Amino acid sequence: MALPPEVCIRGAGIVGRTLALLLARERVRVALVAEAPSTPSPDRPDVRAYALNAASRSLLESLRAWPDAAQATPVREMQVFGDEDGRVRFDAAEQKVDALAWIVDVPALEEQLAAAVRFSPQVEVVTAPVKAALTVVCEGKASLTREALGVQYDVTRYPQIAIAARLEAERPHGGVARQWFSAQGDVLALLPMGGAEGRQLALVWSVGQLRAPELLALEADAFCARLREASHEALGGFTLSSERAAWPLQRATADRWAGRFAEGGAWVLAGDAAHTVHPLAGQGLNLGLADAAELARVIRERDYWRSVGDARLLRRYERARRADVLAMGLATDGLQQLFAQGIEPLARLRNWGMLGFDRSHLLKSWVARRAMGLASGISSPSPSGRGLG
């Protein structure tokens, strides 16, 4: 890159690389700060998987960064079960779409994005921050840059631990994502992987802080037996195909998303550096990619005489994204709180509510289309292939 960068992106994760590619497509010069890649241990493979909606898929496909079919399994149906007889079913055919979402293998997606960045002449990968008109902080929820800027990260800690692993099921998953809410507030999600007729699953089991150590200490067979019971034999038995990972759950939002450095230049937050939500709705990465898309859009549509770090642009980005993140955060928080209450009348009410919601086709369709990113969030790429429409 002969000329100095206009934008410095701190953090080369999925959101950071996506933003770099979006800006590069608009001929914006980008410096992408990346740490030296770590080699995963063969004994402890990366078990992360994300549910990506149609808007996120369209965005990544426009950047030629969508993984192969084997690493992006379509979800044709989603079944959500309450702690009694409550049940909600979403079906792709009813929504007239190919899939409700895709369960994507994180290492495969990261590899696709890294390859796209390597072939982008507008993006220079650097090992330390450089001066630019705009610095975008995409360092994740533990961002050191955000902390150094004095930005308050308002955290609500849930009394839950997420346990993640890869599984092999006794029966094919059929492209169905299944989720159970228990009377104790636990949320069990079994996400299909390995193709539409595969048996591989991504497990995300959000359990109470006191129960998590017990489950993690179990031998593999005993853990799978508990899992089989919690999933009501929906897929028969399970075999662990990876180590188990665990982390505490939280919802958080930064009190400021944009500002200026004392020495000059603007900064803005994106992705988990700006916000996190409970994983029960599977929307965390979709929100981060929508951040990247919106920031790229306001930069693309700016008046020719405005800098990429213009305060008006960054306020426009923050207003748009805060509203979307707040709505999703409140929705996931409300669901978590609703099922965390063990009061019997409330249990009957929430299960009755699930049944009523399942019968309300208009409301269910509206919720489904929002979750797919078809009602708000990420815009589709423009017909010219430049930017977002």
What are these regions (language model features)?
Residues 60, 134-246, 253, 258:
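Conserved FAD-binding catalytic core of PHBH/FMO-like flavoproteins
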